[in-house]
């Protein structure tokens, strides 16, 4: 019985401890300051692509939400302080 409790304790500790780690894709040593560290020498990151109607239709967007608007060919992020989508291209 003690052995079973020890195994359960070790497994639960591992699960709880894993929740505090960061994730590395393409790297075995993710940067400690990042929750997600993506590394590649020949690929990029593809963020969600929406047209303007889809972007404006996002229900309750989170502060800092990033999308690529295919109508403008530009990145937009949502800012709660202004309750609006802000362009990163200064064209919209």
Residue locations for each model-derived region?
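C-terminal trimerization/auto-chaperone modules of long, extracellular attachment fibers and adhesins
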Residues: 3, 19-92
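Sec-dependent N-terminal signal peptides
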Residues: 3-13
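Sec/Tat signal peptide C-region and signal peptidase I cleavage site
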Residues: 14-18
């Amino acid at each position: 019985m003690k052995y079973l409790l020890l195994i359960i304790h070790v497994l639960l500790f591992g699960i709880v401890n894993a929740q505090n780690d960061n994730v590395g894709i393409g790297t075995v040593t993710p940067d400690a300051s990042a929750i997600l560290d993506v590394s590649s020498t020949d690929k990029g990151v593809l963020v969600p692509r929406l047209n303007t109607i889809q972007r404006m239709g996002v229900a309750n967007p989170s502060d800092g939400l990033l999308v690529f608007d295919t109508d403008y060919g530009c990145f937009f992020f949502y800012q709660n302080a202004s309750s609006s989508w802000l362009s990163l291209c200064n064209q919209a």
